[in-house]
């Protein structure tokens, strides 16, 4: 499906990197405009709806996202990236996993702090200087980068190109800390 929909795609990489897959299994996208390198190189990383492996459900699930993104979290499954060659697709897969680790750490430390819309716009305008010709869009503030560049708080969503993202709410952090503490104590 990737090759049919976009002529610039010459390679796909699919894997189950643990942190990115954890986000996919928890129902969270990686679309907040937080890390300049990711905004510059990938834009955002949406969570696609669940599809049963081996059939047409996964290609059907990613189809609505292919024109706007190069990296995807596959709900309850893993990660898929596309690129101009195998090295480009692999680099994007590695970048997705690194961003997932950074995002998880930021959320555990109290929440992500998004880049301002003017700063996001500046990064998008810098893409040609770095040889990045594709323009992706911010699902939270749109192409014009007006408004907040972060996902609205609330329950994660997995349907549609504007899928939600974890908000790093204090109650969530507290629950995680309590669970980790309990598990550590069990091991002592």
Can you describe what each PLM-predicted range is?
Residues 1-188:
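Glycine-rich flexible loops
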């Amino acid at each position: 499906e990737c090759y049919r929909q976009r002529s610039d795609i010459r390679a796909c990489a699919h894997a189950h990197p643990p942190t990115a897959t954890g986000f996919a299994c928890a129902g969270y996208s990686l679309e907040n405009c937080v890390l300049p390198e990711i905004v510059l190189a990938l834009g955002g990383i949406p969570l696609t709806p669940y599809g049963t492996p081996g059939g047409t459900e996964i290609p059907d699930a990613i189809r609505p996202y292919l024109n706007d993104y190069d990296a995807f979290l596959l709900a309850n499954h893993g990660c898929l990236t596309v690129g101009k060659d195998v090295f480009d697709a692999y680099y994007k897969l590695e970048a997705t996993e690194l961003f997932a680790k950074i995002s998880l750490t930021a959320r555990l430390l109290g929440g992500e702090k998004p880049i301002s819309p003017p700063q996001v716009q500046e990064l998008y305008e810098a893409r040609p200087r770095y040889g990045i010709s594709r323009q992706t869009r911010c699902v939270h503030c749109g192409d014009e980068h007006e408004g907040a560049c972060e996902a609205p708080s609330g329950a994660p969503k997995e349907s549609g190109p504007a899928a939600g993202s974890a908000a790093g709410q204090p109650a969530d952090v507290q629950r995680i800390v309590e669970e980790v503490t309990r598990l550590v104590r069990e091991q002592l």
